[in-house]
From Swiss-Prot:
K(+) binds at D131. A monovalent cation. Ammonium or potassium. This is Type III pantothenate kinase. Catalyzes the phosphorylation of pantothenate (Pan), the first step in CoA biosynthesis.
Amino acid sequence: MLLAIDVRNTHTVVGLLSGAKQHAKVVQQWRIRTESEVTADELALTIDGLIGEDSERLTGATGLSTVPSVLHEVRIMLEQYWPSVPHVLIEPGVRTGIPLLVDNPKEVGADRIVNCLAAYQQFAKAAIVVDFGSSICVDVVSAKGEFLGGAIAPGVQVSSDAAAARSAALRRVELARPRSVVGKNTVECMQAGAVFGFAGLVDGLVARIREDVKGFSADDDVAVVATGHTAPLLLPELHSVEHFDEHLTLHGLRLVFERNREAQRGRLKPAR
């Protein structure tokens, strides 16, 4: 059983995966709030409480964090509470197997890397990956499995909350699909702007990528896959997205874990 920890700015996903390679599957998943000042002990109490008896069945652990301080605590937690369980955390120096063809590879978030890795492994062709989180990341991986870069926009909830915080006449609303793109009250108007507006934003970015990037035209075979906790809200309004995989990041973490563990055992040549 593999423990996978995906720490983002707002929420943390904890998952358990059974099997390996093409037979791997996510058997449990939990979403908890990310606390930037959480300690290793607090993390251990929370995760041990979630996974229960499966704690004794762990054969490996892996994780990433877009919050550097939390990644440090995850490392301490694994070393102190599961010292016999091998672990691989996504950080500089870790083999991912995906070349980063960007100006500064160290700036690329670990979440973006593992998402593209998982998409390429799943579809075996060029892909555009849309991750709906605190930010919306639209990332591009070539037919050769190279990370080409992408675009980052504010997330749906973040933008909606910011609009409410900066205007006395607006308030925080529940993100839900309104009856129409033409809202009849303030809540519906904000929902329409969030749902239909961001669907248009993503469709526009995907269309621009397919126009501007060689090998991604309408005539090319390209997978467009979405992931992230707000993706289901927008999927019915998206025209460009063909696939949805809620476990894409967890599988990307698994792939990096497997690659590094096998490399350590000498069964793989070091990845680029």
